[in-house]
Amino acid sequence: MKMQYRLLIIIVGLMAVVSFFYWRWPIMTGKLNGQTIYLAVLNSFHVKDSHAHPQFMLIDDDSGKGIYKIREICERVGVKATFAVVPAFLDSARCDSLKKWQQEGYGIALHSYDHGRWKDWTKEEVVSDIDRSLAFLRERGFETNKINLVVTPGFYNTRAIRSAVATKGMKMIMGANVVNPDTTTSQWGRLFIKKETDIDETRGVLLRAKEKKGFVVFGTHSSIPDEFSAEKTEEILRIAHQIGLKLK
């Protein structure tokens, strides 16, 4: 009899766990990886902001020559992107352009000083690298008090990186194909727009995000021609804008 009760308790417990994750599991796309599962589980326990509304943003990595294409797309659609800069990759012209755009309302995020392997670094080394990037931008006239987002190079996510970013009071973008529950979480997933991205599938994700009042972060590598699609980037931003997601 005791065995039957134990079995019943186990079954009820498993059903409760499955039910919990079923209702709270976030929207995901693409291939599963360790970071996607990690963030999905983390977000399942997140207490959603009661004032949340569906939002989106675009982050373009590496601050290469493709930033001008992103700027053109944003101006046509009527949105403003955030540029994840790598100071060591910047020439004076792009630096001046990004500084001017920040003054116009475009965002600036950090993407390490020279795209180093943060995966193998200590917390202190990551903090030092963040400080070095901020100092570079500050010296060139950027408003570094407005920079509060770190896009980890290589999408690495280690305890040292998380601790370093938290120490700086910033949020981080990781390599997880997850729609975020809202903007209050400290780690954000991101959906990349590439040449092979399915527009209809992405529209479906955006509609579900709107229904759940989620926060969609899109990513692009505008400076990698083999990956970047200006046409799909513009179309997806228009869809997000048209179905009612607000720009973060």
Where are the language model's segments positioned?
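A short, acidic, amphipathic alpha-helical segment used as a generic capping/interface helix at domain edges
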Residues: D198-A209
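A conditional alpha-helix N-cap/helix-loop micro-motif detector
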Residues: D91, K195-I199
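A structural signal for short, well-ordered beta-strand segments and their strand-loop junctions
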Residues: M172-G175, K246-K248
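Short secondary-structure boundary/capping segments
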Residues: V47-D49, K99-K100, L207-R208
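Metal-dependent polysaccharide deacetylase catalytic core of the NodB/CE4 family, i.e.
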Residues: H53-F56, K69, E75-S163, T167-K171, ...
